[in-house]
Regions:
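C-terminal transmembrane helical hairpin of 12-TM major facilitator-type secondary transporters
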Residues: 280-328
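Residue-level signature of mid-helix packing/kink "hotspots" within the transmembrane helices
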Residues: 24, 52-60, 144-145, 260-264, ...
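Extracytoplasmic gate region of multi-pass secondary transporters
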Residues: 26-27, 213-264
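Cytoplasmic membrane-interface "Motif A"-like loop-to-helix N-cap segments
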Residues: 68-78, 275-289
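Conserved MFS/SLC helix-loop-helix module at the cytosolic interface between two early adjacent transmembrane helices
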Residues: 57-93
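A late C-terminal transmembrane helix in Major Facilitator Superfamily
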Residues: 333-370
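Juxtamembrane intracellular "pre-TM" segments in multi-pass secondary transporters
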Residues: 1-2, 185-217
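Cytoplasmic helix-loop-helix junction between adjacent transmembrane helices
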Residues: 101-140
Length: 397
């Protein structure tokens, strides 16, 4: 196996894990946070979409900062923002203060992929690109798994506030670890780069005009990521509604972990396959159609269903809606080229996060309008199928 930049790869992966765990704690702990703050479970869970909305904006504005200060320095800033969110959330006395915590994380949440891609792309051989970026993206489901496994016991031990406070240790350790190697990887910085120019976001949008082949991928990134959060952020609330409060521990510690763990294993396997046998584009098409199947099944969840069937479908949702991102980012890196890695992955991140920010609140609204999850999931199925079809047509051309 050709050399893989393991040190920056693992550090950037764990940075993503720390930020994701903090964000997903909002949904995992929502059944306990909501009564304390006098709101509905879904009102807390949808704050994850607030993180992603602000993250989308940060993804579009961060590339100049990456070029000037370096990807590892930005990774430190991400961990600082994560620590700020955890501190604010742990002392929240209202949904407004909790929202402020979500905003403090979101302001740099979208910087994870562009900053790490800027560091990893020049250090990674082309034949290992899909594998490296798939491993890097493991940080997302890893953070979700840590949240699913650790948050419920922490809540039982000391309440939901402890669940946020305990994560501060992880964030602070990451700040120190990245600082130790920052100078080794933050080389070639453009110290004269104007970081406040408005042309940065314009350049990102301009890639859609300059690179026609990126457009179907852009649409798929938007829809697939929206579907990912519709599955991931609402697994706990949906299963609590189906099985009652007694189903909380199954939902958070089994179903949600199955979703995230499947995303981890799939990313690694598909990264190897894409580097050796089947192109990343066709794998992304297949994932879209399987995502559609999983959404249709999720629409029919009922209290008469055995737990094992729910777990299987959660694993399928994780393998597709969560497992696709490594391949997608590798494709954005390939299309952007070495000089526009931060910009191309910034565009990809922004589209993914805008998809989350748009689809998750609409999904939440659909739950209220249709008094359940069935029709919202059927709509998700229609969108993922259409996106996969467009990507397939674009790939054939």
């Amino acid at each position: 196996m050709q050399k893989i930049p393991w040190t920056p790869l693992l550090l950037t992966m764990l940075t993503q894990a720390a930020a994701t765990m903090a964000a997903y704690t909002l949904s995992t702990a929502s059944p306990y946070i909501a009564p304390d703050l006098g709101v509905e479970n879904e009102d807390v869970a949808q704050l994850v979409a607030v993180v992603y909305l602000l993250g989308a904006m940060s993804a579009m504005t961060v590339p100049p900062f990456i070029h000037r200060f370096g990807g590892m320095t930005i990774s430190i800033a991400i961990c600082v923002a994560t620590a700020a969110m955890l501190s604010i959330a742990s002392f929240a006395s209202s949904i407004g203060i909790l929202t402020l915590g979500a905003l403090s994380l979101g302001v740099l949440y979208g910087s994870t992929a562009p900053s790490s891609s800027h560091v990893l792309a020049p250090l990674t051989a082309e034949k290992r690109r899909n594998f490296v970026f798939s491993v890097r993206q493991i940080g997302v489901p890893l953070g979700g798994i840590l949240g699913g496994l650790l948050v419920p016991p922490l809540i039982l031990i000391g309440g939901w506030r402890i669940a946020f406070q305990a994560q501060l240790i992880f964030a602070l350790v990451m700040i120190f670890a990245i600082f130790l190697v920052r100078s080794r990887y933050d080389h070639g910085r453009d110290r004269n780069r104007n970081v406040w120019s408005l042309t940065g976001p314009i350049r990102l949008v301009g890639l859609l005009r300059e690179l026609p082949e990126i457009r179907p991928l852009a649409i798929a990134a938007f829809v697939y990521s929206g579907a990912q959060l519709c599955f991931g952020a609402f697994i706990v609330t949906q299963l609590v509604r189906v099985y009652g409060q007694d189903g909380y521990h199954f939902a958070s510690a089994v179903a949600l972990v199955a979703f995230q763990l499947s995303g981890i294993t799939t990313r690694i396997v598909l990264g190897v396959i894409a580097d050796s046998w089947i192109s990343a584009r066709w794998l992304l098409v297949a994932q879209g159609f399987l995502m559609t199947l999983s959404a249709i099944v999720a629409a029919g969840y009922d209290s008469s269903w055995p737990y094992w069937l729910i777990v299987i479908n959660c694993a399928l949702a994780g393998a597709t809606a969560s497992g696709y991102t490594g391949l997608a980012f590798a494709e954005f890196v390939r299309m952007g080229g070495p000089k526009r890695t931060a910009e191309a992955t910034g565009l990809g991140t922004a589209l993914m996060f805008f998809g989350v920010a748009a689809m998750a609140p609409l999904f939440r609204l659909g739950i209220d309008i249709f008094n359940g999850y069935a029709i919202p999931y059927f709509l998700v199925a229609a969108l993922t199928a259409a996106s996969a079809l467009l990507l397939a047509i674009g790939t054939r051309r």
